[in-house]
Amino acid sequence: MKLVVGLGNPGKQYEKTKHNIGFMVIDAIADSVPHTTWSEEQRAEVCSITVDGEKVLLVKPQTFMNLSGESVGPLMRYYKIDPSDVYCIYDDMDLPIGKLRIRPNGSSGGHNGIKSLISHIGTENFPRFRVGIGRPLPQWTVIDHVLAPFSEESQEKVQKGIKDTVKAVLGTLEVGMDKGMNQFNPKRRPQR
């Protein structure tokens, strides 16, 4: 069994914000494949899908971003899921809007939701699907940036990023992290 966790903030007022790209991807995964009814479990909205014969829980913590680990840690322990089987989808300001980067592990990179997961999971060794939300405008704070909706002009990139991430998550669930990273990470241009 695997957990696929999308990070975000609960509530209508946060629904379309950049910080909620993880929730948007989870919803798009659920819209693309048959799934069970959503239910509340360990302070998260949870449903299950089946990928390649394996049960996968789709998870949207309802604790607010900075406390996400308080939901994910207990879910992981309840279902006896190894950290390497907890796939986390979240926003990344260091990537251009809609761009995806998959990593098998790593530090929080200053992301408070990831800091909370690391604290409650007990390790940095869990897979990440980072979705770009771009850098804030010079006059904006980081908080203003992540809690603002995507601009109208960026919607095409956002929707493509969500679609690409859905494909990457489902594909990686089928082929495993190493092959998934090779297949779905952006290809680097050779150095000249």
Model-assigned labels for residue ranges:
Residues K2-N105, K115-S119, T123-F129, P136-T141, ...:
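Nucleotide and nucleotide-moiety/phosphate-recognizing core
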Residues S108:
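Conserved TIR/SEFIR loop-to-helix hotspot centered on a Trp-containing motif
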